[in-house]
Amino acid sequence: MPNRGAHFSISRRKDFLMDFSERVFCGHLTPDHTGRRVLLAGWVDAFRDHGGLLFIHLRDRNGIIQIVFSPEAASADVYRQAASLRAEYCVAVQGEVRKRLPGTENPHIETGDIEVFVSELTVLSESEALPFAISDKAMVAGASSAGADHVNEDLRMQYRYLDIRRPAMQKNLILRHRISQCVREFLDSRGFVEVETPVLTMSTPEGARDYLVPSRIHPRSFYALPQSPQLFKQLLMIGGMERYFQLARCFRDEDLRPNRQPEFTQLDIEASFIDEEFLYELIEELTVRMFAIGGIALSRPFPRMTYAEAMDTTGSDRPDLRFGLRMADVTGVFSRTSYSIFKQILQRGGSIKGINIKGQSEKLSKNVLQNEYAKEIAPSFGAKGMTWMRAEEGKLESNIVQFFSADELEALKRVFQVEDGDVLIMVADPSCAIVNSALGQLRLHLGNRLGLIPEGVFYPVWITEFPLFEPTDEGGVTSSHHPFTAPDRTDFDPGNIEELLSLRSRAYDLVVNGEELGGGSIRINDREVQRRIFAALGLTEEDVKNKFGFFLRAFDFAAPPHGGLALGMDRVVSMILQTPSIREVIAFPKNRSAACPLTGAPSEVKREQLAELGLLNLGDKDVLPGDAEKEDRIDHLSWVSRIGIAEGERPVMESILAQAEELAAQVGDLAGNEEPVRSVAPVANRVREGLEAVRLSFSGTGRLLKNAPAVKGDYFKVAGILD
């Protein structure tokens, strides 16, 4: 077996003594270096043998340079060793920088006008065959290149250290570093002090589940990893720090989505003796500077929109304002309608809203509107139906236009400013929330389908005046943001639900292109107001004392007026780099299942560790964590794939799994330095040959929902993690 460690004898030249202090970065070479001898070190990115000349792309963090091995510059020994190099070998070379011959320049790399003719070579470390391609640069103009863009993401994360070698990933991490430096420098210039807050803290209700850490010293007691530094940053204001910030690590045990991770970084900011305008100005200036690092120019001031306006016109409190398709309320148009569906909805206190899709009648045919949108797409967004009309020759036409009066049709044309070629869609429902939600999702769906959302455009907006409380199913209220947000007025009755739901908060969210980048609020600094907020939430004095006693005690010592905001840095960087997921801007992220394919976390622990932490016999269950019997693998396969496997199919599935294990073992034995071979197997059903897929009726959902991870009513409930 070849030695995989670093070795230096392969150069067979005693005069090549490496002094890495003299090293030049590959990407820093320019035509000004022509004629100079340089020492380079990095990884073999790509290899090309031209029979007598060997061309290699050498890559380090700063870029790629082409190095050349020729009989004229290199000895026979060096040339022979160079011929044995493979992808991702780590090497050091010394040679002369030369300009490339006319016509051989490579526009794919920044150093494409020059190359280095190598005279000395040392292999620092060898690499096994790669699980996926790392190189993403073509060696010659016009050639294609293969990267890791289409590699299974879990495979990339299993070998994340290799994935990080890719220039695209390194660029992401370097730009993230520069954005973090920008944050620190800017906030320091504005008098903010960076302070670290505890990671092991107390569990407090903040909207998501806590990650709990057992204490060995205090058996059966637990720390909680912070969902945010909310209470500590307010305590810093009471402590007189006045202006605080932190790039804080936060942890939330919640369902994953493309822009969520169980652990994430947020820019946490808090300041005393300020108001909303101070924070608007501060965050706008910082946001402009951060986006400028990615070459994106934002104009100031950012527009502002109340929560009510955002919901009324876009159906979302995270509005994407890069395109039109604003919603309009036409409830009044149909106040005396004879159309029975609308009439019944209005009699139940409902509402009717619509959107004018300007000039899109050719793309939205009657068939598309009726059979796709009215029957399938709108119901999938929660609407019970959708009404549509097309404007042609000065008239509105649809399959139900005959049910509306001439006055109603004329009123619609006025409200929506209808012109020929326009398409109207309307949603009606007894619930205004359903109307807003369904029509808002239709707005986004149509914007994407019709290509109305411009690329490379960034539209920031402040959303303000959120409701302070939201109703609960039990008839009470819960905080829209968190219970420390200041209300717009303090003379409220904590027992009057109707009054509580009318309160507005002094909260604000920063939204860009339909995505919330952060949010905050002016905080409560009066102990009595804070107590009444807790009372409105149904917390007893005992609850408050147990959960927030230490916090409220601080209010007895003169808390200053204060407020703050937190920005999700993973989201900010992802948006600036325009990546499909925040996982692309995190060095070692968790996957869609909140697991780490690289380390295998989370993992079981030994019974002895559980005993040391006092976690044995906490409940009455016989099976303990880390002590469970192995789960039947067919049942497990059935559950994770959401495919029902009949008892008669189990032997076939066992055979397939056994064959897969045997093949994996054979492949493992063959692993070596060979280049990987890829092939795509044809789609085939080995277990249920000859069976055709059939559409099941929803009248009986037992079979349909057999393997659902969770069921609510007749619905298959899954985590919102699909990209």
Swiss-Prot record:
EC number: 6.1.1.23
Region (Aspartate): 230-233
UniProt binding sites for ATP: R252, D253, E254, Q261, E516, G568, M569, D570, R571
Binding site for L-aspartate: E206, R252, H481, R523
Subcellular location: Cytoplasm
Alphabetical list of Pfam families matching this protein: GAD (PF02938), tRNA-synt_2 (PF00152), tRNA_anti-codon (PF01336)
Cross-referenced NCBIfam families: aspS_bact, PRK00476.1, PRK12820.1
Family: Belongs to the class-II aminoacyl-tRNA synthetase family. Type 1 subfamily.
Subunit structure: Homodimer.
Purpose: Aspartyl-tRNA synthetase with relaxed tRNA specificity since it is able to aspartylate not only its cognate tRNA(Asp) but also tRNA(Asn). Reaction proceeds in two steps: L-aspartate is first activated by ATP to form Asp-AMP and then transferred to the acceptor end of tRNA(Asp/Asn).
This protein's name: Aspartate--tRNA(Asp/Asn) ligase 1
Taxonomy of the source species: Bacteria, Pseudomonadati, Thermodesulfobacteriota, Syntrophia, Syntrophales
